[in-house]
Amino acid sequence: MANQGQRVSWGDESTKTRGRSNSRGRKNNNIPLSFFNPITLQQGSKFWNLCPRDFVPKGIGNRDQQIGYWNRQTRYRMVKGQRKELPERWFFYYLGTGPHADAKFKDKLDGVVWVAKDGAMNKPTTLGSRGANNESKALKFDGKVPGEFQLEVNQSRDNSRSRSQSRSRSRNRSQSRGRQQFNNKKDDSVEQAVLAALKKLGVDTEKQQQRSRSKSKERSNSKTRDTTPKNENKHTWKRTAGKGDVTRFYGARSSSANFGDTDLVANGSSAKHYPQLAECVPSVSSILFGSYWTSKEDGDQIEVTFTHKYHLPKDDPKTGQFLQQINAYARPSEVAKEQRKRKSRSKSAERSEQDVVPDALIENYTDVFDDTQVEIIDEVTN
Protein backbone atom coordinates (compact mmCIF):
# COMPACT_ATOMS: atom_id res chain seq x y z
CA MET A 1 0.00 0.00 0.00
CA ALA A 2 1.38 3.38 -0.88
CA ASN A 3 2.38 5.45 2.12
CA GLN A 4 0.82 8.64 0.76
CA GLY A 5 -2.70 7.24 0.35
CA GLN A 6 -5.69 8.91 -1.29
CA ARG A 7 -8.75 10.74 -0.03
CA VAL A 8 -11.85 8.54 0.30
CA SER A 9 -14.81 9.48 -1.89
CA TRP A 10 -17.67 7.01 -2.01
CA GLY A 11 -19.39 8.67 -4.96
CA ASP A 12 -22.17 6.45 -6.36
CA GLU A 13 -20.60 3.16 -5.22
CA SER A 14 -23.10 0.50 -4.14
CA THR A 15 -23.23 -0.16 -0.40
CA LYS A 16 -23.89 -3.91 -0.88
CA THR A 17 -20.47 -4.60 -2.40
CA ARG A 18 -18.43 -3.24 0.51
CA GLY A 19 -15.91 -5.78 1.79
CA ARG A 20 -18.12 -8.87 1.41
CA SER A 21 -16.99 -12.23 -0.02
CA ASN A 22 -17.51 -15.97 0.36
CA SER A 23 -13.91 -16.65 1.41
CA ARG A 24 -13.09 -17.51 5.01
CA GLY A 25 -11.28 -14.92 7.12
CA ARG A 26 -8.08 -15.83 8.93
CA LYS A 27 -8.32 -17.23 12.47
CA ASN A 28 -6.42 -15.66 15.35
CA ASN A 29 -6.89 -16.48 19.01
CA ASN A 30 -4.87 -13.42 20.06
CA ILE A 31 -7.06 -10.88 18.33
CA PRO A 32 -6.28 -7.24 19.26
CA LEU A 33 -8.83 -5.37 21.35
CA SER A 34 -11.10 -2.73 19.84
CA PHE A 35 -11.15 0.80 21.26
CA PHE A 36 -14.97 0.64 21.40
CA ASN A 37 -17.81 -1.45 22.79
CA PRO A 38 -19.38 -3.77 20.19
CA ILE A 39 -22.67 -3.68 18.31
CA THR A 40 -25.02 -6.66 18.73
CA LEU A 41 -26.93 -7.31 15.50
CA GLN A 42 -30.59 -8.28 15.53
CA GLN A 43 -30.89 -11.91 14.44
CA GLY A 44 -31.95 -12.33 10.82
CA SER A 45 -30.46 -8.96 9.79
CA LYS A 46 -27.51 -8.41 7.44
CA PHE A 47 -24.95 -5.99 8.84
CA TRP A 48 -23.58 -5.01 5.42
CA ASN A 49 -27.06 -4.10 4.17
CA LEU A 50 -27.76 -1.83 7.14
CA CYS A 51 -24.40 -0.28 8.00
CA PRO A 52 -23.95 3.28 6.59
CA ARG A 53 -20.69 3.53 4.65
CA ASP A 54 -19.50 6.42 6.87
CA PHE A 55 -20.36 4.55 10.10
CA VAL A 56 -17.12 5.42 11.96
CA PRO A 57 -17.37 5.89 15.77
CA LYS A 58 -16.55 9.33 17.17
CA GLY A 59 -13.83 10.07 19.68
CA ILE A 60 -10.45 8.87 18.35
CA GLY A 61 -8.10 10.11 15.63
CA ASN A 62 -8.05 13.14 13.36
CA ARG A 63 -10.03 13.81 10.16
CA ASP A 64 -7.60 11.83 7.99
CA GLN A 65 -7.89 8.75 10.23
CA GLN A 66 -11.69 8.30 10.17
CA ILE A 67 -11.46 5.06 8.18
CA GLY A 68 -11.59 1.39 9.15
CA TYR A 69 -13.75 -1.73 9.27
CA TRP A 70 -16.31 -3.60 11.35
CA ASN A 71 -15.23 -7.14 12.22
CA ARG A 72 -17.81 -9.87 12.88
CA GLN A 73 -17.81 -12.05 15.99
CA THR A 74 -20.03 -15.13 15.65
CA ARG A 75 -21.37 -16.61 18.88
CA TYR A 76 -23.30 -19.67 20.00
CA ARG A 77 -24.08 -21.65 23.12
CA MET A 78 -24.57 -25.35 23.77
CA VAL A 79 -28.04 -26.38 24.97
CA LYS A 80 -28.41 -30.08 25.80
CA GLY A 81 -25.59 -30.90 23.42
CA GLN A 82 -27.07 -28.83 20.59
CA ARG A 83 -25.47 -25.69 19.20
CA LYS A 84 -27.76 -22.66 19.34
CA GLU A 85 -26.73 -19.57 17.40
CA LEU A 86 -26.65 -16.22 19.25
CA PRO A 87 -26.81 -12.72 17.70
CA GLU A 88 -23.59 -11.61 16.01
CA ARG A 89 -21.42 -8.93 17.53
CA TRP A 90 -19.39 -6.47 15.47
CA PHE A 91 -16.24 -4.66 16.64
CA PHE A 92 -14.70 -1.58 14.98
CA TYR A 93 -11.01 -1.25 14.07
CA TYR A 94 -9.18 1.55 12.29
CA LEU A 95 -7.45 0.87 8.95
CA GLY A 96 -4.09 -0.79 9.52
CA THR A 97 -5.03 -2.13 12.98
CA GLY A 98 -6.86 -5.09 14.51
CA PRO A 99 -7.15 -8.68 13.21
CA HIS A 100 -6.91 -7.51 9.57
CA ALA A 101 -4.12 -4.96 10.03
CA ASP A 102 -2.49 -6.00 6.73
CA ALA A 103 -5.66 -5.67 4.64
CA LYS A 104 -6.15 -2.83 2.18
CA PHE A 105 -9.23 -0.65 2.23
CA LYS A 106 -12.15 -2.42 0.45
CA ASP A 107 -10.40 -5.82 0.35
CA LYS A 108 -13.11 -8.49 0.24
CA LEU A 109 -12.91 -10.43 3.51
CA ASP A 110 -15.53 -12.62 5.10
CA GLY A 111 -17.02 -10.96 8.19
CA VAL A 112 -15.56 -7.52 7.37
CA VAL A 113 -17.46 -4.35 6.39
CA TRP A 114 -15.39 -1.30 5.39
CA VAL A 115 -16.42 2.23 6.40
CA ALA A 116 -14.91 5.69 6.08
CA LYS A 117 -15.80 9.35 6.41
CA ASP A 118 -15.62 11.31 3.18
CA GLY A 119 -12.20 12.94 2.97
CA ALA A 120 -10.39 10.38 5.16
CA MET A 121 -6.98 9.21 3.92
CA ASN A 122 -6.85 5.73 2.38
CA LYS A 123 -3.73 4.59 4.27
CA PRO A 124 -2.94 2.83 7.59
CA THR A 125 -3.86 5.04 10.54
CA THR A 126 -1.17 3.86 13.01
CA LEU A 127 -3.73 4.36 15.80
CA GLY A 128 -3.10 0.86 17.14
CA SER A 129 -5.57 -0.96 19.38
CA ARG A 130 -6.68 -0.89 23.02
CA GLY A 131 -4.50 -2.21 25.82
CA ALA A 132 -5.89 -5.02 27.96
CA ASN A 133 -5.90 -2.80 31.07
CA ASN A 134 -7.79 0.08 29.40
CA GLU A 135 -11.56 0.45 29.27
CA SER A 136 -13.43 0.35 25.98
CA LYS A 137 -15.35 3.45 24.88
CA ALA A 138 -19.09 3.82 24.40
CA LEU A 139 -20.12 4.03 20.73
CA LYS A 140 -21.18 7.47 19.45
CA PHE A 141 -22.00 8.40 15.85
CA ASP A 142 -22.76 11.55 13.88
CA GLY A 143 -25.69 9.99 12.01
CA LYS A 144 -28.67 7.81 12.84
CA VAL A 145 -28.03 4.31 14.18
CA PRO A 146 -30.08 1.55 12.45
CA GLY A 147 -32.79 0.09 14.66
CA GLU A 148 -31.38 -3.41 14.20
CA PHE A 149 -28.11 -2.33 15.89
CA GLN A 150 -27.91 -2.61 19.67
CA LEU A 151 -25.04 -0.52 21.03
CA GLU A 152 -23.67 -2.55 23.92
CA VAL A 153 -23.96 -0.80 27.28
CA ASN A 154 -20.90 -0.57 29.48
CA GLN A 155 -20.79 -2.94 32.45
CA SER A 156 -18.84 -2.95 35.67
CA ARG A 157 -15.23 -3.93 35.22
CA ASP A 158 -15.34 -5.45 38.70
CA ASN A 159 -17.85 -8.06 37.45
CA SER A 160 -15.37 -9.37 34.86
CA ARG A 161 -12.63 -9.41 37.48
CA SER A 162 -14.80 -11.29 39.98
CA ARG A 163 -15.71 -13.93 37.35
CA SER A 164 -12.01 -14.43 36.60
CA GLN A 165 -11.21 -14.70 40.30
CA SER A 166 -14.04 -17.19 40.75
CA ARG A 167 -12.63 -19.43 38.01
CA SER A 168 -9.18 -19.16 39.57
CA ARG A 169 -10.52 -20.13 43.00
CA SER A 170 -12.31 -23.12 41.46
CA ARG A 171 -9.06 -24.38 39.91
CA ASN A 172 -7.20 -23.90 43.18
CA ARG A 173 -9.84 -25.87 45.10
CA SER A 174 -9.57 -28.73 42.62
CA GLN A 175 -5.77 -28.80 42.81
CA SER A 176 -5.68 -28.71 46.62
CA ARG A 177 -8.38 -31.36 47.21
CA GLY A 178 -5.80 -34.17 47.43
CA ARG A 179 -3.69 -32.24 49.95
CA GLN A 180 -6.77 -31.47 52.04
CA GLN A 181 -7.75 -35.15 52.23
CA PHE A 182 -4.29 -36.03 53.49
CA ASN A 183 -4.35 -33.21 56.06
CA ASN A 184 -7.84 -34.21 57.22
CA LYS A 185 -6.66 -37.75 58.00
CA LYS A 186 -3.73 -36.34 59.93
CA ASP A 187 -5.98 -33.95 61.87
CA ASP A 188 -8.39 -36.80 62.75
CA SER A 189 -5.56 -38.79 64.31
CA VAL A 190 -4.46 -35.81 66.43
CA GLU A 191 -8.05 -35.12 67.50
CA GLN A 192 -8.57 -38.73 68.62
CA ALA A 193 -5.38 -38.60 70.69
CA VAL A 194 -6.46 -35.33 72.39
CA LEU A 195 -9.94 -36.70 73.19
CA ALA A 196 -8.44 -39.85 74.71
CA ALA A 197 -6.12 -37.76 76.92
CA LEU A 198 -9.02 -35.55 78.11
CA LYS A 199 -11.12 -38.60 78.92
CA LYS A 200 -8.33 -39.97 81.12
CA LEU A 201 -8.33 -36.64 82.98
CA GLY A 202 -12.07 -36.96 83.63
CA VAL A 203 -13.23 -34.33 81.13
CA ASP A 204 -16.46 -35.41 79.40
CA THR A 205 -16.25 -33.59 76.06
CA GLU A 206 -19.44 -35.19 74.74
CA LYS A 207 -21.59 -33.60 77.49
CA GLN A 208 -19.95 -30.21 76.89
CA GLN A 209 -20.77 -30.44 73.18
CA GLN A 210 -24.41 -31.29 73.99
CA ARG A 211 -24.70 -28.26 76.31
CA SER A 212 -23.18 -26.03 73.62
CA ARG A 213 -25.65 -27.29 70.99
CA SER A 214 -28.54 -26.73 73.43
CA LYS A 215 -27.52 -23.10 74.02
CA SER A 216 -27.19 -22.48 70.28
CA LYS A 217 -30.68 -23.88 69.71
CA GLU A 218 -32.13 -21.64 72.44
CA ARG A 219 -30.55 -18.57 70.85
CA SER A 220 -31.90 -19.50 67.41
CA ASN A 221 -35.41 -19.93 68.83
CA SER A 222 -35.36 -16.55 70.59
CA LYS A 223 -37.50 -13.74 69.21
CA THR A 224 -36.07 -12.00 66.12
CA ARG A 225 -35.12 -8.40 66.78
CA ASP A 226 -37.70 -5.98 65.45
CA THR A 227 -36.06 -3.79 62.78
CA THR A 228 -39.16 -1.75 61.93
CA PRO A 229 -38.30 1.99 62.04
CA LYS A 230 -39.91 3.89 64.94
CA ASN A 231 -41.62 6.76 63.10
CA GLU A 232 -44.70 7.55 65.21
CA ASN A 233 -43.30 10.51 67.18
CA LYS A 234 -40.96 11.87 64.52
CA HIS A 235 -41.34 14.79 62.13
CA THR A 236 -42.12 13.82 58.52
CA TRP A 237 -38.64 14.85 57.41
CA LYS A 238 -37.04 12.57 60.06
CA ARG A 239 -39.03 9.44 59.27
CA THR A 240 -37.52 6.35 57.65
CA ALA A 241 -39.31 4.19 55.08
CA GLY A 242 -39.67 0.62 56.31
CA LYS A 243 -41.23 -2.45 54.73
CA GLY A 244 -44.77 -1.63 53.64
CA ASP A 245 -46.92 1.28 52.51
CA VAL A 246 -45.06 4.61 52.81
CA THR A 247 -48.19 6.77 52.43
CA ARG A 248 -48.77 6.35 56.19
CA PHE A 249 -45.84 8.68 56.80
CA TYR A 250 -45.34 10.61 53.56
CA GLY A 251 -48.86 10.81 52.14
CA ALA A 252 -50.16 9.95 48.67
CA ARG A 253 -48.12 10.81 45.58
CA SER A 254 -48.71 14.35 44.30
CA SER A 255 -46.98 17.26 42.60
CA SER A 256 -45.06 17.97 45.84
CA ALA A 257 -44.21 14.30 46.54
CA ASN A 258 -43.81 12.88 43.05
CA PHE A 259 -41.35 9.99 43.49
CA GLY A 260 -42.41 6.33 43.42
CA ASP A 261 -44.62 4.04 41.37
CA THR A 262 -47.37 1.81 42.81
CA ASP A 263 -44.98 -1.02 43.75
CA LEU A 264 -42.41 1.23 45.43
CA VAL A 265 -45.02 3.16 47.43
CA ALA A 266 -46.80 -0.04 48.52
CA ASN A 267 -43.66 -1.95 49.59
CA GLY A 268 -41.26 0.76 50.76
CA SER A 269 -37.76 -0.51 51.51
CA SER A 270 -38.78 -4.08 50.63
CA ALA A 271 -39.50 -3.10 46.99
CA LYS A 272 -37.35 -5.02 44.49
CA HIS A 273 -35.29 -2.06 43.22
CA TYR A 274 -35.18 -0.01 46.46
CA PRO A 275 -31.42 -0.61 47.10
CA GLN A 276 -30.53 0.50 43.55
CA LEU A 277 -32.76 3.59 43.83
CA ALA A 278 -31.23 4.50 47.20
CA GLU A 279 -27.76 4.46 45.61
CA CYS A 280 -28.87 7.31 43.33
CA VAL A 281 -29.78 9.61 46.26
CA PRO A 282 -27.23 12.15 47.62
CA SER A 283 -25.72 11.66 51.07
CA VAL A 284 -26.70 13.81 54.07
CA SER A 285 -23.45 15.78 53.95
CA SER A 286 -23.83 16.29 50.20
CA ILE A 287 -27.33 17.73 50.71
CA LEU A 288 -26.22 19.81 53.70
CA PHE A 289 -23.17 21.40 52.11
CA GLY A 290 -24.07 21.20 48.41
CA SER A 291 -27.58 22.69 48.40
CA TYR A 292 -29.19 26.12 48.18
CA TRP A 293 -31.25 26.74 51.32
CA THR A 294 -34.11 29.18 52.06
CA SER A 295 -36.56 29.53 54.95
CA LYS A 296 -39.77 31.38 55.82
CA GLU A 297 -42.32 31.46 58.63
CA ASP A 298 -45.38 29.21 58.30
CA GLY A 299 -47.67 29.81 61.26
CA ASP A 300 -45.97 28.47 64.38
CA GLN A 301 -43.38 26.61 62.27
CA ILE A 302 -40.52 27.46 59.93
CA GLU A 303 -40.74 26.16 56.36
CA VAL A 304 -37.31 25.21 55.02
CA THR A 305 -36.69 24.65 51.30
CA PHE A 306 -33.51 23.47 49.64
CA THR A 307 -32.56 22.94 46.00
CA HIS A 308 -29.93 20.31 45.27
CA LYS A 309 -28.43 19.64 41.85
CA TYR A 310 -26.33 16.57 41.02
CA HIS A 311 -25.51 14.29 38.10
CA LEU A 312 -26.07 10.60 37.38
CA PRO A 313 -24.40 8.51 34.63
CA LYS A 314 -26.80 8.36 31.68
CA ASP A 315 -25.88 4.80 30.67
CA ASP A 316 -26.11 3.36 34.20
CA PRO A 317 -29.14 0.99 34.43
CA LYS A 318 -29.81 2.36 37.93
CA THR A 319 -30.30 5.83 36.43
CA GLY A 320 -33.05 4.50 34.15
CA GLN A 321 -34.78 2.84 37.10
CA PHE A 322 -34.50 6.07 39.11
CA LEU A 323 -35.96 8.25 36.34
CA GLN A 324 -38.88 5.83 35.93
CA GLN A 325 -39.97 6.68 39.48
CA ILE A 326 -40.21 10.45 38.90
CA ASN A 327 -43.88 11.43 38.34
CA ALA A 328 -44.76 7.73 38.04
CA TYR A 329 -48.03 8.36 39.90
CA ALA A 330 -49.22 10.53 36.99
CA ARG A 331 -48.66 7.82 34.33
CA PRO A 332 -49.33 4.43 35.96
CA SER A 333 -50.19 2.50 32.78
CA GLU A 334 -47.10 3.78 30.94
CA VAL A 335 -44.81 2.87 33.86
CA ALA A 336 -46.30 -0.63 34.16
CA LYS A 337 -45.81 -1.24 30.43
CA GLU A 338 -42.17 -0.09 30.53
CA GLN A 339 -41.45 -2.28 33.56
CA ARG A 340 -42.86 -5.33 31.78
CA LYS A 341 -40.69 -4.63 28.73
CA ARG A 342 -37.58 -4.13 30.88
CA LYS A 343 -38.25 -7.38 32.76
CA SER A 344 -38.65 -9.25 29.46
CA ARG A 345 -35.36 -7.81 28.11
CA SER A 346 -33.57 -8.73 31.34
CA LYS A 347 -34.71 -12.38 31.15
CA SER A 348 -33.73 -12.56 27.48
CA ALA A 349 -30.26 -11.15 28.24
CA GLU A 350 -29.75 -13.67 31.05
CA ARG A 351 -30.60 -16.58 28.74
CA SER A 352 -28.30 -15.38 25.96
CA GLU A 353 -25.30 -15.01 28.30
CA GLN A 354 -25.39 -18.65 29.47
CA ASP A 355 -22.84 -21.12 28.06
CA VAL A 356 -21.60 -18.75 25.33
CA VAL A 357 -18.91 -20.36 23.17
CA PRO A 358 -17.46 -17.77 20.73
CA ASP A 359 -15.54 -18.72 17.63
CA ALA A 360 -11.84 -18.00 17.15
CA LEU A 361 -12.25 -14.40 15.98
CA ILE A 362 -13.34 -12.96 19.32
CA GLU A 363 -12.39 -10.43 21.93
CA ASN A 364 -13.66 -10.02 25.46
CA TYR A 365 -14.15 -6.28 25.82
CA THR A 366 -13.48 -4.48 29.10
CA ASP A 367 -16.07 -1.81 29.79
CA VAL A 368 -17.05 0.91 32.27
CA PHE A 369 -19.73 3.57 32.28
CA ASP A 370 -19.51 6.47 29.88
CA ASP A 371 -19.23 10.02 31.27
CA THR A 372 -22.41 11.28 29.58
CA GLN A 373 -24.61 12.60 32.39
CA VAL A 374 -28.18 13.67 33.08
CA GLU A 375 -29.06 16.51 35.40
CA ILE A 376 -31.46 15.98 38.35
CA ILE A 377 -32.94 18.83 40.41
CA ASP A 378 -34.66 18.11 43.75
CA GLU A 379 -36.80 20.56 45.72
CA VAL A 380 -37.71 19.41 49.23
CA THR A 381 -40.09 21.46 51.38
CA ASN A 382 -41.32 18.98 54.04
UniProtKB/Swiss-Prot annotation:
PTM description: ADP-ribosylated. The ADP-ribosylation is retained in the virion during infection. Phosphorylated on serine and threonine residues.
Region (Disordered): 1-29, 150-240, 328-358
The keyword Ion transport belongs to this UniProt entry's keyword annotation: no
One Gene Ontology CC term in the entry: host cell endoplasmic reticulum-Golgi intermediate compartment
Modified residues (Phosphoserine): S9, S156, S254, S256
MF annotations from Gene Ontology: RNA binding
Region annotated Dimerization, chain positions: 231-334
Compositional bias (Basic and acidic residues): 201-235
Comp. bias intervals (Low complexity): 154-163
Top-level taxon of origin: Viruses
Region entry RNA-binding, spans: 33-159
Record carries keyword tRNA processing: no
Domain CoV N NTD: 31-153
Family annotation (InterPro entries): N_prot_C_CoV, N_prot_N_CoV, NCAP_aCoV, Nucleocap_CoV, Nucleocapsid_C, Nucleocapsid_N
Localization per Swiss-Prot or TrEMBL: Virion; Host endoplasmic reticulum-Golgi intermediate compartment; Host Golgi apparatus
Domain CoV N CTD: 224-337
Comp. bias (Basic residues): 17-27, 164-176
Keywords: ADP-ribosylation, Host Golgi apparatus, Phosphoprotein, Ribonucleoprotein, RNA-binding, Transcription, Transcription regulation, Viral nucleoprotein, Virion
Functional summary from the UniProt entry: Packages the positive strand viral genome RNA into a helical ribonucleocapsid (RNP) and plays a fundamental role during virion assembly through its interactions with the viral genome and membrane protein M. Plays an important role in enhancing the efficiency of subgenomic viral RNA transcription as well as viral replication.
Assembly description: Homooligomer. Both monomeric and oligomeric forms interact with RNA. Interacts with protein M. Interacts with NSP3; this interaction serves to tether the genome to the newly translated replicase-transcriptase complex at a very early stage of infection.
Family the UniProt entry places it in: Belongs to the alphacoronavirus nucleocapsid protein family.
Protein name, per record: Nucleoprotein
Species in which this protein is naturally found: Porcine transmissible gastroenteritis coronavirus (strain Purdue) (TGEV)
Organism phylogeny: Viruses, Riboviria, Orthornavirae, Pisuviricota, Pisoniviricetes
